[in-house]
Regions:
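Conserved active-site segments centered on acidic
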Residues: 2-104, 112-116, 192-196
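Phosphate-binding/catalytic loops
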Residues: 4-10, 20, 119-196
Length: 196
């Protein structure tokens, strides 16, 4: 019969819990942000979910800096997502919060204005926030062996002008097509790098 030293087991458990508090497990969540959370960030969330598959340990969410709270996906964007077989019908726009930022490993925005707005509100999260297309672009520099979250947190490059994804809201079918295409192309580089 095996005897257990209960005191030693409790002491070890306390040490593990203390370590977890000091070094919490890395989040496996990506937050996408745009203005209204009805076009670009919503598209990124649902395309990322589709590309990563149901068995991925990564989760994806989206929010807006000026969200049209409770709204579904914008007209024309919905058609673009449907044509790609992307499931987005449960979407309800929401406003970005400190809690969403805290829970996320990375926050990928569509324009520099989104980055600046978030940093003004919550400067402590600056290292997590980058443009979506910027991450796709620098992935080629980093190589697949580099941890993407650590690499992006350490990245000290300003985004390039071409990293911006223009807002397609109320600009018609062509603007929606271009935005969704740019988002999808960026995510086809990012999702494999995450190992999702």
């Amino acid at each position: 019969m095996t005897q257990f030293n209960v005191g030693a087991l409790l002491k070890k458990r306390r040490r593990v819990e203390e370590e977890e508090l000091r070094y919490p497990p890395m989040s496996k969540k990506i937050l996408f942000v745009c203005t209204g959370n009805i076009a670009r960030s919503a598209s990124a969330q649902y395309i990322a979910e589709q590309l990563s598959g149901s068995d991925s340990e990564w989760t994806f969410d989206s929010a807006g800096t000026g969200a049209i709270v409770g709204s579904g996906v914008a007209p024309f964007i919905d058609s673009e997502l449907e044509s790609r077989g992307v499931n987005f019908h449960s979407h309800q726009a929401k406003q970005i919060t400190a809690q969403l930022l805290e829970e996320s490993a990375l926050v990928l925005v569509m324009e520099k204005e989104h980055l600046n707005w978030i940093v003004r509100e919550w400067p402590q999260y600056r290292s997590k926030i980058h443009l979506l297309k910027q991450m796709a672009r620098v992935q080629e520099q980093a190589g697949r062996r580099v941890n993407p979250v650590s690499f992006m947190h350490a990245l000290d490059q300003p985004p390039a002008k071409e990293d911006r994804i223009a807002d397609p809201y109320r600009k018609g079918a062509e603007a929606a097509r271009v935005a969704v295409e740019e988002i999808e192309l960026a995510l086809t580089k990012i999702i494999p790098w995450l190992g999702a």
